[in-house]
Amino acid sequence: HNILNNDAARIDMPVGVINGAKDGPTLIVTGGLFATEFSGVEAASRMYRDFDPKDISGRLIIIPVITLDAFQFRTPMFNLSSGVSPRDGKSLNGVFPGNKDGSPTEVLAHYVFNELVMKSDYHIDLRGGDLSESHVIHSIHPNNADRETNRISEDMSRACGFEYFQARDVDPRSLVYEASQAGIPSIITQCGLGYKTQAEEDFINSHISAVTNIMKHFNMMAGSPIIHQNQKEFTVGFDQVRAKSFGTFQGIADQGDILKKGQLIGRVTGLDGSVLEELHSPINGVVHELLVRRVVSQGDLLYNLVQIKG
């Protein structure tokens, strides 16, 4: 779909619509909000290819890649900058609900938000760990909308079926925040080892399973969601582990690992092999995210750790 076309910029975005055989709600699924989170992109593409209208009640809108220019230019999110458009240097996930008279990224955000998200009943954003990230599989729902929207979003987050889910005060001007503020229940599925670039099947299938479960939850598909038997909720916020030395980072713990307080999780070494620093877990918890940097400076974020409620 063409959104902007002038002498300065042309913006296109792939949009797939599956109109079900029966009436029902409208669900919009977005991928590629951060364009190098490839597992979400691949999952969205496969769902458009494989989902049969005969099996659907309602309408499913699928955007495999919102930020097509960043996807084509392989613009990552990394330590110094969020993933940005090569057209105007802006991050799409920081300019919602957009501006029809703004820069190219703001025009794109305005179209996605007003013409697609606001005309839907529910929204799922498929994420996948960016090129610097190794993420545990989990779902995220906003905790800072009105009570009813928060409730429905949490129901969606649980219905994904993952072992872990998390409530979060999401950032203003992000897609999930602005959608939920407008009364559109909106969640994130986070599945992927972004640094591998070739998205692994387990993570792709986790996205697809989550969307399928949510469609069953809303009676858009027949059957009942398949839910992990022992779901756990992450606490809000992170315990961060940062480098205190300049050197080469050797990660020992990875996403999903269960940690004891004081456990060795990594080292920073010199080029002569000397150990400059040992990294230990500050909590009993779970590795939410490993930042897969090799060369690190003082202050670089290496781990986000979370605790489990209860």
Describe the function of each predicted region.
Residues 1-310:
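Structured catalytic-domain cores with a bias toward divalent-metal coordination
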